[in-house]
Amino acid sequence: GEAVGLLKADICLDSDIAHLILKPHPWRSLKTRGSQRAVPLISSSLWAAKRLLESNAGGPFCFPRYTNEERCNANSASAALNKWLREHTEEGCVIHSFRHSLRDRLRAVECPSDIVDAIGGWSTNSVGQSYGNGYPLEVLSKWMEKI
């Protein structure tokens, strides 16, 4: 549901490190405070973000079929993606599998768990993790480039 509610303005390609900003909007909230974050765009995610901006001319929304000023229909978007995945991937692969895969791939390169949580927007159990501004994009990007 996070991506479905994105505005084109939430995709930042003109900074030193291309990234997207996940933040609450009136049409889509986020689950936790940790869900609000900047996520570096690298490799295929950067390609997809550029393609999304190029192919989606009018209006402010990245996915206008599923989002408007009043609501974000993440369930319909998820159902459509899961249908496509059933037809094009191995059995059992669903859209949520990508979050599990991200965590597994970051673990495989020995990424520290607090950085994994920062990238994925997962909350941590440590009170100390909520202090400060979090990791800079350079650090997050360094780990994402390893996967």
Where are these regions (language model features)?
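Conserved tyrosine-mediated DNA breakage-rejoining catalytic core shared by Y-recombinases
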Residues: 1, 5-50
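C-terminal catalytic core of tyrosine-transesterase DNA break-rejoin enzymes
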Residues: 1-2, 76, 80, 97-123
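Active-site/catalytic core of tyrosine-dependent DNA strand-transfer enzymes
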Residues: 25-26, 42-91
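Catalytic-site neighborhood detector that most strongly recognizes the C-terminal catalytic loop/helix
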Residues: 26, 46, 68-69, 113, ...
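Residue-level marker of regulatory loop/turn positions in helix-turn-helix DNA-binding domains and
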Residues: 33, 95-96
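Short, solvent-exposed beta-strand edge segments and adjacent coil->beta transition regions
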Residues: 34-36, 60, 128
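Extended, non-catalytic subsegments within catalytic or DNA/protein-binding/adaptor domains
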Residues: 35, 55-57, 142, 147
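Bulky hydrophobic/aromatic "packing anchor" residues in well-ordered structure
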Residues: 62-63, 103, 131
